Amino acid sequence: MLKIADVEFESRLFTGTGKFSNSQVMLEAIRASKSQLVTVAMKRIDFKIGLDDLLTPLRQVGVQLLPNTSGARNAKEAVFAAELAREMLGTRWIKLEIHPDPKYLMPDAIETLEAARILCEKGFIVLPYVHADPVLCRRLEEVGCAAVMPLASPIGSNQGLVTESFLKIIIEQARVPVVIDAGIGAPSQAARAMELGADAVLVNTAIASSASPIVMAECFKEAVQCGRRAFEAGLGRVQTGAVQTSPLTGFLNQ
């Protein structure tokens, strides 16, 4: 069971809501994934019409919403988006995203740390999206973040665990849950992330852009489960040379 702040999750696969062809496909994919935590960008919500076509069906599914500050260019904008989410959605949970570069969407470490400090002081449950930087992740822990969400590779790139060496360090040192976010493009990559010891993964593009999003969601669900079980079972140690599975005995000389 995964616990973040005061909430427990049976599923270690978190999902997003962007890039789906329509809301019905999105809902069916979320159901198939068995995800219990779903991110939604504040910039996509039309509060003028109350509970819009995005929020209403998500609440009917029964998942916990994790509003994000995607689109924020600095700490001030991110804090504003988080406070809007708390007021309009009634949640203290926030996925903190600050990426001023519209091309590569790389997170701004300095602004993210500052926003995290402010939001934690205001009582938010903060899950920051950041570079796979062990030092930064430790600093975010220290200011009170409930989890850290280091990237595997650029958002939506499907490149997989490009930052694996750094993710290993973060997982080793973390005292809060580590959710690997961004760039996971295949179920095998999600399984690998879980084998490393990640507490969860967040997948959106790889599911939403698939020719069969519902089937792909099921595949990711199973991959995450298998990866976690493999981690808990204990993977064999990697050797530099060959190791005999059946050591030679003297029977050949008899």
Swiss-Prot record:
This is Thiazole synthase. Homotetramer. Forms heterodimers with either ThiH or ThiS. It is found in: Cytoplasm. Its EC number is 2.8.1.10. Gene3D superfamilies: Aldolase class I. Belongs to the ThiG family. The active site is at 95 (schiff-base intermediate with dxp). PANTHER family: THIAZOLE SYNTHASE. One of its GO terms (cellular component) is cytoplasm. Pfam families: ThiG (PF05690). Catalyzes the rearrangement of 1-deoxy-D-xylulose 5-phosphate (DXP) to produce the thiazole phosphate moiety of thiamine. Sulfur is provided by the thiocarboxylate moiety of the carrier protein ThiS. In vitro, sulfur can be provided by H(2)S. Pathway: Cofactor biosynthesis; thiamine diphosphate biosynthesis. Coiled coil: none annotated. It catalyses: [ThiS sulfur-carrier protein]-C-terminal-Gly-aminoethanethioate + 2-iminoacetate + 1-deoxy-D-xylulose 5-phosphate = [ThiS sulfur-carrier protein]-C-terminal Gly-Gly + 2-[(2R,5Z)-2-carboxy-4-methylthiazol-5(2H)-ylidene]ethyl phosphate + 2 H2O + H(+). It comes from the Bacteria. The keyword Disulfide bond does not apply. 1-deoxy-D-xylulose 5-phosphate binds at residues 156, 182-183, 204-205. InterPro entries: Aldolase_TIM, Thiazole_synthase_ThiG, ThiG. Keywords: Cytoplasm, Schiff base, Thiamine biosynthesis, Transferase. CDD domains: ThiG. GO terms for molecular function: thiazole synthase activity. One of its GO terms (biological process) is thiamine diphosphate biosynthetic process.
